[in-house]
C-alpha cells in the first residue's frame, strides 16, 4: 500500500536507532554522556589499548580501530588526489588569516570526503586517513638552520597565533555543529624549535621566563583559549630538566589549570619512550608510563608502545585506574565528537 511504501521510504531516509542496547550507541546523547557510558564497560587492558595512537578494534563493544595520526600541513597529506597548498611559511607571508581559513576549510572538506569514501566502500580507519589531524605547527622559527622551519608560520609569536587560529577553525569547523569536521592539534609543546638531531635528548634549561611566556607560549595559549583546539602535542625534549610529555608544569599547571584546556594531549612519536630511554628521568617503561600519564599525556604515539605497560603500572601502584579513566574519557569523548562511531549519514 501507499502507507507501507512511505513508511519504508522514511526508514531508508533516516538512520535507524534500533539495535542500540547501550547509551553510548545513541547519537542523540551528548558526546560526554556516551563516553561515560562506554568507559564503564571497558576493562583496564582495553583502556590501555585505546590510549595508543593506533588503537585496535574492540569488537565486543563495536569499537572500530582508530588512528590519531593524520597530517594536513598544507593540505590533506598522504591521501592521494587532493589539493596541495603552499608551505605554511609561504602562507604566513600573505598576512591573510581569512584566506588561510579558506585553505584549511577546503582541506578539511577533502579529508572528510576521503574518509567517508573509504568507510562507505568497506575500508577502515588508517594512519593518515583519519579524522584527527596533527596540524598546525605553531613553533617559532627562530633559527633558519632548523630543517623543519618551513612547517611554521615564522618567527613572530603574534602572527603565528593569528595564522594558527585560522588553521584550527578551518580544520575543525563551526563550534555549534553536531560534530567537528576534524580534530586539529597544536604542536610541539613547548619550546621546540630545533635543532632536529638533538630533539630526543635535549634539556632546555636556559630558557628565560620572559622568553618562554613572550615567545614560545603565546600561540599555544591563543589556540587553546580562542580557537578551541582539540589536541595539543607534547614535544620530545625536556624543559627545565623535565621531559615535556612528563612535565606537569606544562601539561597541567599551565595548559589545563591556567588556560582551561579540556581536551586531548597527545605525545610526539616516541616521546614517552624518551623519558626513560634517552632523558633517563624514569627507571623503566612502567615508571615512564605512570610519569607521562600523571603529568597529563592522554594518548601515546610510539613504535614500541610504552603505554602498553599501563596495567602493570596500576598493579604496581604507580597510577590508579581512576587516573587512567580520566584519559580514556577524554579520548572517547573526542571520538564521539567526531562522529567516528556513528552512521556517516548523520
Please place each PLM-identified region on the residue numbering.
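Glycoside hydrolase catalytic-domain context in secreted enzymes
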Residues: 9-346
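Bacterial N-terminal signal peptides
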Residues: 1-8
Amino acid at each position: 500500500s501507499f502507507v507501507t511504501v512511505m513508511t519504508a521510504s522514511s526508514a531508508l531516509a533516516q538512520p535507524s536507532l534500533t539495535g542500540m542496547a547501550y547509551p553510548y550507541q545513541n547519537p542523540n546523547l551528548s558526546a560526554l554522556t556516551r563516553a561515560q557510558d562506554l568507559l564503564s564497560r571497558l576493562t583496564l587492558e582495553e583502556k590501555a589499548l585505546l590510549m595508543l595512537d593506533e588503537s585496535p578494534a574492540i569488537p565486543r563493544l563495536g569499537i572500530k580501530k582508530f588512528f590519531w595520526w593524520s597530517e594536513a600541513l598544507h593540505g590533506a597529506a598522504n591521501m592521494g588526489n587532493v589539493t596541495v597548498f603552499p608551505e605554511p611559511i609561504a602562507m604566513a607571508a600573505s598576512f591573510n588569516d581569512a584566506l588561510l581559513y579558506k585553505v584549511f576549510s577546503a582541506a578539511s572538506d577533502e579529508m572528510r570526503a576521503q574518509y567517508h569514501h573509504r568507510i562507505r566502500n568497506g575500508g577502515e580507519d588508517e594512519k593518515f586517513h583519519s579524522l584527527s589531524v596533527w596540524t598546525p605547527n605553531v613553533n617559532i622559527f627562530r633559527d633558519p638552520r632548523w630543517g623543519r622551519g618551513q612547517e611554521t608560520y615564522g618567527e613572530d609569536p603574534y602572527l603565528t597565533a593569528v595564522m594558527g587560529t585560522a588553521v584550527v577553525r578551518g580544520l575543525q569547523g563551526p563550534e555549534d555543529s553536531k560534530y567537528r569536521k576534524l580534530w586539529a592539534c597544536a604542536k610541539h609543546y613547548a619550546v621546540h624549535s630545533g635543532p632536529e638531531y638533538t630533539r630526543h635528548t635535549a634539556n632546555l634549561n636556559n630558557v628565560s621566563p620572559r622568553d618562554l611566556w613572550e615567545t614560545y607560549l603565546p600561540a599555544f595559549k591563543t589556540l587553546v583559549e580562542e580557537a578551541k583546539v582539540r589536541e595539543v602535542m607534547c614535544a620530545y625534549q625536556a624543559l627545565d630538566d623535565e621531559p615535556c610529555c612528563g612535565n606537569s608544569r606544562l601539561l597541567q599547571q599551565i595548559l589545563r589549570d591556567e588556560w582551561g584546556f579540556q581536551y586531548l594531549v597527545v605525545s610526539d612519536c616516541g616521546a614517552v619512550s624518551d623519558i626513560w630511554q634517552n632523558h633517563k628521568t624514569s627507571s623503566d617503561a612502567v615508571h615512564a608510563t605512570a610519569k607521562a600519564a600523571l603529568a597529563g599525556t592522554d594518548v601515546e604515539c610510539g613504535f614500541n608502545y610504552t603505554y602498553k605497560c599501563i596495567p602493570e603500572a596500576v598493579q604496581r601502584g604507580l597510577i590508579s585506574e581512576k587516573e587512567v579513566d580520566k584519559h580514556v574519557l577524554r579520548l572517547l569523548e573526542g571520538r564521539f565528537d567526531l562522529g567516528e562511531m556513528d552512521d556517516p549519514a548523520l
